[in-house]
Amino acid sequence: FYPTILELTGATLKPYQHKDGVSLVPLLKGNRVFDRGAIYFHYPHYVGKGDSPAGAIRKGDYKLIWFYEDDHIELYNLKMDISEKENLAETQKERALSLQKELQEWLCSCAAKMPVYNPDYKEIKY
């Protein structure tokens, strides 16, 4: 939202502060066409029980999620399956691998930090 706020307030855009952000002002002005290509997501953290580090790419109707810990991927057609119940990674392998490659290239291009194993970690039982 940062580029949108900057544009609405007349402030100078600062791309070095919002590398992959874009202004939504054209949408607010009624322009229904908004093609931003792919949207990328990288979250290399453990947050709560059951959560694991992952990255994702949303391109067109498809969303691919790559779980770093066990290296598995999930692919969803969000137009047909908004609740992400039918994993298409096995039935659309070529699309899944292509999106995973694109996500990997983006991660490399922005020097994304990946999770590393901490041998000193000790779980605390409450």
Regions found by a protein language model. Give the residues of each.
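C-terminal cap/loop subdomain of S1 sulfatases and analogous C-terminal strand-loop tails that border
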Residues: 2-78, 113, 125-126
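Bilobed periplasmic-binding protein-like "clamshell/Venus-flytrap" ligand-binding domains
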Residues: 36-37, 100, 104-117
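C-terminal structured subdomain/cap of oxidoreductase catalytic cores
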Residues: 78, 92-95
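Intrinsically disordered, low-complexity polar regions and short flexible loop motifs
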Residues: 81
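A glycine-rich phosphate-binding loop feature that marks nucleotide/adenosyl-phosphate handling sites
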Residues: 119-122
